[in-house]
Amino acid sequence: MITGIQITKANNEALLNSFWLLDDEKAELRCVCAKSGYAEDQIVPTSELGEIEYREVPLEVQPTVRVEGGQHLNVNVLSRDTLEDAVKNPEKYPQLTIRVSGYAVRFNSLTPEQQRDVITRTFTESL
């Protein structure tokens, strides 16, 4: 089960008043917002934050059904390792082309933020 939390006490002062989504089953936290040191949507093991105290924040999840027409599917046949390696070694993948929003685009032409977003949205395992 996912629980929303606000950190009220921590050894790391940057964590004070930050908001997280806590997944007890996987012992992971997803950052919603923090002063510094953690990016939005960054997932970390709970042990990384050290000794903390927190208060639960109610989460409101309302299922909504919105029909706006057809569906869209981008199919990229490659592995997460390939994309991660392309981020680290772009010179090895000058012709790597992926589908983004219906368009073919060279992976290396994307900004680092866009590359990370593609990897995150394409290969999800939790949260």
Swiss-Prot record:
<feature type="modified residue" description="Glycine radical">
    <location>
        <position position="102"/>
    </location>
</feature>
<dbReference type="InterPro" id="IPR050244">
    <property type="entry name" value="Auton_GlycylRad_Cofactor"/>
</dbReference>
<feature type="domain" description="Glycine radical">
    <location>
        <begin position="5"/>
        <end position="127"/>
    </location>
</feature>
<dbReference type="GO" id="GO:0008861">
    <property type="term" value="F:formate C-acetyltransferase activity"/>
</dbReference>
<dbReference type="InterPro" id="IPR011140">
    <property type="entry name" value="Glycyl_radical_cofactor_GrcA"/>
</dbReference>
<protein>
    <recommendedName>
        <fullName>Autonomous glycyl radical cofactor</fullName>
    </recommendedName>
</protein>
<comment type="function">
    <text>Acts as a radical domain for damaged PFL and possibly other radical proteins.</text>
</comment>
<dbReference type="GO" id="GO:0005829">
    <property type="term" value="C:cytosol"/>
</dbReference>
<dbReference type="InterPro" id="IPR001150">
    <property type="entry name" value="Gly_radical"/>
</dbReference>
<dbReference type="InterPro" id="IPR019777">
    <property type="entry name" value="Form_AcTrfase_GR_CS"/>
</dbReference>
<keyword id="KW-0556">Organic radical</keyword>
<dbReference type="Pfam" id="PF01228">
    <property type="entry name" value="Gly_radical"/>
</dbReference>
